[in-house]
């Protein structure tokens, strides 16, 4: 009994030392400076990022959702809504990127899709049944440009900011591989596929509330053909965010669709 009593102060002192050591380690981690940006995207993003509080995030999410509903042409509000409501979905997307070799390369390279980064003259020389040629045709037919996407501003984590940027810049590529135009019927259908594929809340909002703006004839076609097609493809298609589209320009577009599990809607 005497030996146990003599050991007790030593044990208490040991526990105290271990506790102090743990506190010191936590203090070192807490006081460590923020890691330096690792690449050009992160360096630029930290310069342009707008820091907001949790309250401001909720306020922006509510305000942008109302503004987007009142005027769907407010792309700035739609972009704000995507950033203030999509963080959980973006973390899930990041997991899928890291689980894929192709996705890992995207996160390492952080490619951008602009007229300054894509050789469109080269894409125009590709055979018409390639993905690159189909993309150029889509841009011309719908009179759109890859330079029209808004910059991400409100996400704290730069990796998530890149994923949101990547989602926006790949939107027209998704249209291309799905063979959907940019009219309201096509946009709503693509939004359903994107919603089910990415889990982003703004995509669900665009799909649900965008359908309200369809004209009667469009709504009948939507309910009979487009919606069932979009739901089926959204559930069946492989994750689209980890696809390194820029490495697929020369791939036969029919083979690409088959690989991803995409079927094209017969619009006849």
UniProtKB/Swiss-Prot annotation:
It is found in: Mitochondrion inner membrane. One of its GO terms (cellular component) is extrinsic component of mitochondrial inner membrane. Its main location: mitochondrion. Zn(2+) binds at residues 171-172, 175, 187. Keywords: Lyase, Membrane, Metal-binding, Mitochondrion, Mitochondrion inner membrane, Ubiquinone biosynthesis, Zinc. It is an enzyme of class 4 (lyase). Pfam families: Coq4. This is Ubiquinone biosynthesis protein COQ4 homolog, mitochondrial.
């Amino acid at each position: 009994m005497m030996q146990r009593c003599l050991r007790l102060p030593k044990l208490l002192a040991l526990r105290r030392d271990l506790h102090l050591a743990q506190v010191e380690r936590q203090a070192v981690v807490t006081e460590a400076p923020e890691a330096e940006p690792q690449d050009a995207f992160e360096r630029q993003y930290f310069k342009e990022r707008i820091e907001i509080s949790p309250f401001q995030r909720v306020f922006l999410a509510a305000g942008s959702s109302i503004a987007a509903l009142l005027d769907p042409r407010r792309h700035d509000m739609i972009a704000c809504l995507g950033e203030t409501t999509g963080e959980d979905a973006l973390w899930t997307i990041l997991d899928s990127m890291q689980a894929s070799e192709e996705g890992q390369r995207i996160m390492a390279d952080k490619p951008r899709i602009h007229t300054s980064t894509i050789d469109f003259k080269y894409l125009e020389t590709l055979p018409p049944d390639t993905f690159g040629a189909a993309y150029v045709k889509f841009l011309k037919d719908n009179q759109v440009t890859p330079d029209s996407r808004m910059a991400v501003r409100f996400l704290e984590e730069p990796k998530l900011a890149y994923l949101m940027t990547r989602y926006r810049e790949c939107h027209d590529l998704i249209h291309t591989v799905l063979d959907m135009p940019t009219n309201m019927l096509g946009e709503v259908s693509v939004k359903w596929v994107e919603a089910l594929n990415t889990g982003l809340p703004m995509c669900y909002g665009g799909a649900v509330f965008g359908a309200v703006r369809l004209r009667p004839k469009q709504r009948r076609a939507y309910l009979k053909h487009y919606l069932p097609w979009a739901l089926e493809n959204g559930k069946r298609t492989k994750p689209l965010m980890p696809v390194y589209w820029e490495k697929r320009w020369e791939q036969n577009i029919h083979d690409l669709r088959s690989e991803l599990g995409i079927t094209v809607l017969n619009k006849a």
